[in-house]
A protein has these predicted regions:
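Short, glycine/charge-rich beta-strand/loop segments that flank catalytic centers
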Residues: 91-109, 120-122
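Acyltransferase donor/substrate-recognition loop-hinge adjacent to the catalytic core
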Residues: 111-183
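Active-site rim helix/loop that mediates acceptor-substrate recognition in acyltransferases
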Residues: 27-45, 186-205
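Short, extreme N-terminal leader segments that mark the start of a protein/domain
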Residues: 1-21
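Conserved donor-binding loop and adjoining core beta-sheet/short helix segment
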Residues: 17, 28-99, 212-239
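Accessory, usually C-terminal, subdomains that scaffold auxiliary metal cofactors
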Residues: 179, 189-248
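Residues that form generic nucleotide/phosphate-binding pockets
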Residues: 18-21, 81, 85, 106, ...
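Short N-terminal binding/cap micro-motifs at the start of the first secondary-structure element
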Residues: 12, 25-28
Length: 248
Protein backbone atom coordinates (compact mmCIF):
# COMPACT_ATOMS: atom_id res chain seq x y z
CA UNK A 1 0.00 0.00 0.00
CA UNK A 2 1.19 3.49 -0.82
CA UNK A 3 1.55 5.94 2.05
CA UNK A 4 1.36 9.54 0.84
CA UNK A 5 2.76 12.65 2.52
CA UNK A 6 1.83 16.25 1.57
CA UNK A 7 4.51 18.21 -0.30
CA UNK A 8 6.12 20.87 1.91
CA UNK A 9 9.27 22.99 1.79
CA UNK A 10 11.00 20.37 3.92
CA UNK A 11 10.16 17.60 1.46
CA UNK A 12 11.55 19.35 -1.64
CA UNK A 13 15.09 18.00 -1.07
CA UNK A 14 13.60 14.48 -0.99
CA UNK A 15 11.88 14.97 -4.35
CA UNK A 16 14.69 16.82 -6.07
CA UNK A 17 16.99 13.79 -6.77
CA UNK A 18 14.22 12.23 -8.86
CA UNK A 19 13.39 15.40 -10.76
CA UNK A 20 17.07 16.21 -11.27
CA UNK A 21 17.40 13.35 -13.75
CA UNK A 22 13.79 13.30 -14.98
CA UNK A 23 13.68 13.10 -18.82
CA UNK A 24 9.99 13.95 -19.29
CA UNK A 25 10.46 17.64 -20.24
CA UNK A 26 7.22 18.83 -18.66
CA UNK A 27 7.10 21.58 -16.04
CA UNK A 28 4.81 19.55 -13.78
CA UNK A 29 7.68 17.11 -13.24
CA UNK A 30 9.66 19.45 -10.99
CA UNK A 31 9.90 20.08 -7.27
CA UNK A 32 9.25 23.79 -7.83
CA UNK A 33 5.83 23.27 -9.42
CA UNK A 34 4.79 20.72 -6.82
CA UNK A 35 5.69 23.10 -4.00
CA UNK A 36 4.67 26.43 -5.53
CA UNK A 37 1.25 25.16 -6.61
CA UNK A 38 0.66 22.75 -3.73
CA UNK A 39 -2.45 24.68 -2.67
CA UNK A 40 -4.06 24.06 -6.06
CA UNK A 41 -2.66 20.62 -6.88
CA UNK A 42 -2.77 19.31 -3.30
CA UNK A 43 0.27 17.24 -4.20
CA UNK A 44 1.34 14.30 -2.06
CA UNK A 45 4.31 12.00 -2.56
CA UNK A 46 5.29 8.41 -1.89
CA UNK A 47 8.19 6.16 -2.83
CA UNK A 48 7.86 2.66 -4.25
CA UNK A 49 9.87 0.34 -6.49
CA UNK A 50 12.69 2.88 -6.70
CA UNK A 51 10.35 5.54 -8.07
CA UNK A 52 8.78 8.78 -6.89
CA UNK A 53 4.99 8.65 -7.07
CA UNK A 54 3.02 11.90 -6.95
CA UNK A 55 -0.71 12.02 -6.32
CA UNK A 56 -2.51 15.30 -6.98
CA UNK A 57 -6.13 16.12 -6.20
CA UNK A 58 -7.58 18.32 -8.94
CA UNK A 59 -11.22 19.41 -8.63
CA UNK A 60 -11.63 16.77 -5.95
CA UNK A 61 -10.39 13.94 -8.18
CA UNK A 62 -7.17 12.06 -7.24
CA UNK A 63 -4.79 11.99 -10.22
CA UNK A 64 -1.30 10.52 -10.46
CA UNK A 65 1.75 11.82 -12.24
CA UNK A 66 3.61 9.22 -14.27
CA UNK A 67 6.17 7.57 -11.94
CA UNK A 68 9.61 9.17 -11.90
CA UNK A 69 12.34 6.54 -11.61
CA UNK A 70 15.49 6.83 -9.56
CA UNK A 71 18.76 5.13 -10.59
CA UNK A 72 17.34 1.65 -9.88
CA UNK A 73 13.69 2.53 -10.43
CA UNK A 74 11.19 0.12 -11.98
CA UNK A 75 8.40 2.16 -13.57
CA UNK A 76 6.33 -0.89 -14.53
CA UNK A 77 6.43 -2.16 -10.95
CA UNK A 78 5.47 1.30 -9.66
CA UNK A 79 2.49 1.39 -12.03
CA UNK A 80 1.39 -2.01 -10.73
CA UNK A 81 1.67 -0.74 -7.15
CA UNK A 82 -0.49 2.28 -8.07
CA UNK A 83 -3.05 -0.01 -9.70
CA UNK A 84 -3.16 -2.25 -6.61
CA UNK A 85 -3.56 0.78 -4.36
CA UNK A 86 -6.46 2.09 -6.47
CA UNK A 87 -8.06 -1.36 -6.56
CA UNK A 88 -8.03 -1.60 -2.76
CA UNK A 89 -9.67 1.83 -2.56
CA UNK A 90 -12.23 1.04 -5.25
CA UNK A 91 -11.21 3.84 -7.63
CA UNK A 92 -9.97 3.89 -11.20
CA UNK A 93 -6.37 5.01 -11.75
CA UNK A 94 -6.21 8.42 -13.41
CA UNK A 95 -2.92 9.85 -14.66
CA UNK A 96 -2.55 13.52 -15.57
CA UNK A 97 0.11 15.29 -17.65
CA UNK A 98 1.53 12.02 -18.97
CA UNK A 99 4.68 12.45 -21.09
CA UNK A 100 3.92 11.80 -24.75
CA UNK A 101 6.65 9.17 -24.87
CA UNK A 102 4.94 7.19 -22.09
CA UNK A 103 1.26 7.53 -23.05
CA UNK A 104 1.37 4.50 -25.35
CA UNK A 105 2.68 2.31 -22.54
CA UNK A 106 -0.32 3.19 -20.40
CA UNK A 107 -2.69 2.50 -23.28
CA UNK A 108 -1.30 -1.03 -23.56
CA UNK A 109 -1.78 -1.84 -19.87
CA UNK A 110 -5.58 -1.83 -19.74
CA UNK A 111 -8.41 -3.06 -21.98
CA UNK A 112 -10.15 0.33 -21.82
CA UNK A 113 -8.28 3.61 -21.85
CA UNK A 114 -9.42 7.20 -22.39
CA UNK A 115 -6.76 9.71 -23.42
CA UNK A 116 -7.54 13.43 -23.34
CA UNK A 117 -5.27 15.98 -25.00
CA UNK A 118 -5.66 19.26 -23.10
CA UNK A 119 -4.20 22.00 -25.28
CA UNK A 120 -4.37 24.54 -22.44
CA UNK A 121 -2.00 22.37 -20.39
CA UNK A 122 0.75 22.24 -23.01
CA UNK A 123 4.16 23.72 -22.21
CA UNK A 124 6.29 26.00 -24.34
CA UNK A 125 9.50 24.13 -25.15
CA UNK A 126 12.45 25.98 -26.68
CA UNK A 127 15.88 24.91 -27.88
CA UNK A 128 18.59 26.58 -25.80
CA UNK A 129 20.43 27.69 -28.96
CA UNK A 130 17.33 29.49 -30.24
CA UNK A 131 17.04 31.55 -27.07
CA UNK A 132 20.78 32.21 -26.97
CA UNK A 133 20.95 33.71 -30.48
CA UNK A 134 17.39 34.55 -31.61
CA UNK A 135 18.52 33.81 -35.16
CA UNK A 136 16.22 34.00 -38.17
CA UNK A 137 13.13 35.97 -39.13
CA UNK A 138 10.98 34.14 -36.58
CA UNK A 139 12.80 35.91 -33.75
CA UNK A 140 13.22 39.33 -35.38
CA UNK A 141 10.75 40.93 -32.97
CA UNK A 142 12.64 39.67 -29.93
CA UNK A 143 15.94 40.90 -31.38
CA UNK A 144 14.49 44.37 -31.91
CA UNK A 145 13.22 44.53 -28.31
CA UNK A 146 16.58 43.39 -26.96
CA UNK A 147 18.51 45.90 -29.06
CA UNK A 148 16.23 48.69 -27.84
CA UNK A 149 16.71 47.63 -24.22
CA UNK A 150 20.50 47.44 -24.55
CA UNK A 151 20.62 50.87 -26.20
CA UNK A 152 18.57 52.47 -23.43
CA UNK A 153 20.29 50.57 -20.60
CA UNK A 154 24.05 50.64 -21.25
CA UNK A 155 25.94 48.53 -18.76
CA UNK A 156 22.99 46.34 -17.82
CA UNK A 157 24.11 42.82 -16.97
CA UNK A 158 22.63 39.45 -16.08
CA UNK A 159 23.81 38.25 -12.68
CA UNK A 160 23.21 35.06 -10.68
CA UNK A 161 21.00 35.52 -7.63
CA UNK A 162 21.59 33.75 -4.33
CA UNK A 163 20.75 34.35 -0.68
CA UNK A 164 23.61 36.87 -0.72
CA UNK A 165 21.43 39.11 -2.91
CA UNK A 166 18.55 39.29 -0.43
CA UNK A 167 18.65 43.10 -0.26
CA UNK A 168 18.57 43.45 -4.06
CA UNK A 169 15.64 41.05 -4.27
CA UNK A 170 13.73 42.81 -1.51
CA UNK A 171 14.15 46.14 -3.32
CA UNK A 172 13.02 44.56 -6.60
CA UNK A 173 9.79 43.27 -5.07
CA UNK A 174 9.04 46.76 -3.76
CA UNK A 175 9.59 48.22 -7.24
CA UNK A 176 7.55 45.46 -8.85
CA UNK A 177 4.62 45.97 -6.49
CA UNK A 178 4.50 49.64 -7.47
CA UNK A 179 4.09 48.67 -11.15
CA UNK A 180 1.84 45.66 -10.55
CA UNK A 181 -1.55 46.48 -12.06
CA UNK A 182 -3.38 43.15 -11.85
CA UNK A 183 -6.14 43.13 -9.26
CA UNK A 184 -7.53 39.61 -9.58
CA UNK A 185 -7.10 37.32 -6.55
CA UNK A 186 -5.40 34.74 -8.80
CA UNK A 187 -2.75 37.21 -9.98
CA UNK A 188 -2.05 38.42 -6.46
CA UNK A 189 -1.79 34.84 -5.24
CA UNK A 190 0.63 33.92 -8.03
CA UNK A 191 2.86 36.87 -7.11
CA UNK A 192 2.89 35.84 -3.45
CA UNK A 193 3.79 32.26 -4.43
CA UNK A 194 6.60 33.52 -6.66
CA UNK A 195 8.07 35.55 -3.82
CA UNK A 196 7.78 32.54 -1.52
CA UNK A 197 9.69 30.28 -3.93
CA UNK A 198 12.47 32.87 -4.17
CA UNK A 199 12.74 32.74 -0.38
CA UNK A 200 13.98 29.14 -0.68
CA UNK A 201 17.13 29.91 -2.68
CA UNK A 202 19.15 28.82 0.34
CA UNK A 203 18.11 25.20 -0.31
CA UNK A 204 20.28 24.99 -3.43
CA UNK A 205 17.50 23.44 -5.52
CA UNK A 206 16.97 26.26 -8.00
CA UNK A 207 18.94 28.52 -10.32
CA UNK A 208 18.06 32.19 -10.20
CA UNK A 209 19.29 35.28 -11.95
CA UNK A 210 18.35 38.84 -12.75
CA UNK A 211 19.15 41.87 -14.88
CA UNK A 212 21.03 44.50 -12.88
CA UNK A 213 21.27 48.11 -14.02
CA UNK A 214 22.59 51.03 -12.03
CA UNK A 215 22.43 49.07 -8.80
CA UNK A 216 18.82 47.92 -9.20
CA UNK A 217 17.28 44.71 -10.42
CA UNK A 218 15.00 45.26 -13.40
CA UNK A 219 14.02 41.61 -13.82
CA UNK A 220 14.37 38.27 -12.05
CA UNK A 221 13.94 34.63 -13.03
CA UNK A 222 14.01 31.33 -11.18
CA UNK A 223 14.41 27.93 -12.83
CA UNK A 224 15.10 24.29 -12.07
CA UNK A 225 17.18 21.89 -14.16
CA UNK A 226 15.28 18.64 -14.71
CA UNK A 227 17.19 16.21 -16.88
CA UNK A 228 18.32 18.14 -19.95
CA UNK A 229 15.53 20.72 -19.61
CA UNK A 230 15.64 23.99 -17.70
CA UNK A 231 12.15 24.50 -16.28
CA UNK A 232 11.51 28.22 -15.80
CA UNK A 233 9.19 28.66 -12.84
CA UNK A 234 9.22 32.45 -12.49
CA UNK A 235 9.90 35.47 -14.70
CA UNK A 236 9.15 38.93 -13.34
CA UNK A 237 10.25 42.28 -14.74
CA UNK A 238 9.53 45.99 -14.45
CA UNK A 239 7.25 46.89 -17.35
CA UNK A 240 8.49 50.47 -17.31
CA UNK A 241 11.75 49.28 -18.90
CA UNK A 242 10.81 48.37 -22.47
CA UNK A 243 12.38 45.18 -23.79
CA UNK A 244 13.43 43.82 -20.43
CA UNK A 245 11.32 40.65 -20.67
CA UNK A 246 12.82 39.48 -24.01
CA UNK A 247 16.25 40.43 -22.71
CA UNK A 248 15.70 38.27 -19.63
Amino acid sequence: MLHFTPVTAESMPLLRPYYETCPYRLCEYSSGVKYMWRGHLRSEYAFTDGCLVIRNCIDGVPQFDYPIPGPEGDVDAALTTIEDDCRRKGVRPIFSVVPESEAGKLALRWPRVTITNERAWKDYLYHAEDLAHFAGRHYSGQRNHINKFNKEHPGAEFIPLTVENADLLAAFWVDYQQEFQKQSPEAKRELALAQELFSHLDMGLFRAGGILWEGRLLAVALAEKCGETLVCHIEKALYSHAGVYPCL
